[in-house]
């Protein structure tokens, strides 16, 4: 078992091995935050064209559309991931910028005050924003790639992960 594991048991399986939603009713209500990021890699010619056009495509503003789609996804994560709790999202922020010549970095930070964390919401927001960038640019090339998508940090639960955002 890895050193950072709390137990070998998966929390979304009950004692009989059946899928279940975690009961968070006994957890303390605390401020929760999480940041996730995803990346979109473009072919060199496509990246150059996007830079020249100010990250606009024939479909419109790429960053603006990705932020809207990512925010919508954050708010609907519980409808996409079966055992996620519906959460009252207090804040959702995106940072989208170039990380090198061909790599667009998408960072999503989510905050709420609740009994459970917002990691899945941040991961979903970053993922859907990246998928939206792909959709907005696919007329230029299908040779783009997405990833890695990862949790960068989380705060407010039993343990904190990563640097504070």
Curated annotation (Swiss-Prot):
<dbReference type="GO" id="GO:0006777">
    <property type="term" value="P:Mo-molybdopterin cofactor biosynthetic process"/>
</dbReference>
<dbReference type="InterPro" id="IPR036522">
    <property type="entry name" value="MoaC_sf"/>
</dbReference>
<feature type="binding site">
    <location>
        <begin position="120"/>
        <end position="121"/>
    </location>
    <ligand>
        <name>substrate</name>
    </ligand>
</feature>
<feature type="active site">
    <location>
        <position position="135"/>
    </location>
</feature>
<comment type="subunit">
    <text>Homohexamer; trimer of dimers.</text>
</comment>
<feature type="binding site">
    <location>
        <begin position="83"/>
        <end position="85"/>
    </location>
    <ligand>
        <name>substrate</name>
    </ligand>
</feature>
<comment type="function">
    <text>Catalyzes the conversion of (8S)-3',8-cyclo-7,8-dihydroguanosine 5'-triphosphate to cyclic pyranopterin monophosphate (cPMP).</text>
</comment>
<dbReference type="Pfam" id="PF01967">
    <property type="entry name" value="MoaC"/>
</dbReference>
<keyword id="KW-0501">Molybdenum cofactor biosynthesis</keyword>
<keyword id="KW-0456">Lyase</keyword>
<protein>
    <recommendedName>
        <fullName>Cyclic pyranopterin monophosphate synthase</fullName>
        <ecNumber>4.6.1.17</ecNumber>
    </recommendedName>
</protein>
<dbReference type="InterPro" id="IPR023045">
    <property type="entry name" value="MoaC"/>
</dbReference>
<dbReference type="InterPro" id="IPR002820">
    <property type="entry name" value="Mopterin_CF_biosynth-C_dom"/>
</dbReference>
<comment type="similarity">
    <text>Belongs to the MoaC family.</text>
</comment>
<dbReference type="InterPro" id="IPR047594">
    <property type="entry name" value="MoaC_bact/euk"/>
</dbReference>
<comment type="pathway">
    <text>Cofactor biosynthesis; molybdopterin biosynthesis.</text>
</comment>
<dbReference type="GO" id="GO:0061799">
    <property type="term" value="F:cyclic pyranopterin monophosphate synthase activity"/>
</dbReference>
């Amino acid at each position: 078992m890895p050193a950072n594991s709390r137990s070998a048991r998966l929390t979304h399986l009950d004692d009989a091995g059946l899928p279940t939603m975690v009961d968070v009713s006994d957890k303390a209500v605390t401020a929760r935050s999480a940041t996730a990021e995803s990346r979109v890699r473009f072919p060199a010619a496509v990246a150059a064209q996007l830079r020249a056009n100010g990250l606009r495509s024939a479909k419109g503003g790429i960053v603006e559309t990705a932020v809207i789609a990512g925010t919508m996804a954050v708010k609907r994560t519980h409808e996409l991931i079966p055992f996620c709790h519906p959460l009252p999202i207090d804040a959702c922020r995106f940072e989208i910028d170039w990380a090198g010549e061909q790599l667009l970095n998408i960072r999503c930070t989510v905050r709420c005050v609740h009994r459970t964390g917002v990691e899945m919401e941040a991961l979903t927001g970053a993922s859907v924003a990246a998928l939206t960038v792909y959709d907005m640019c696919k007329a230029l090339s299908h040779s783009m790639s997405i990833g890695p998508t990862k949790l960068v940090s989380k705060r407010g639960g039993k343990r904190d992960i990563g640097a504070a955002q």
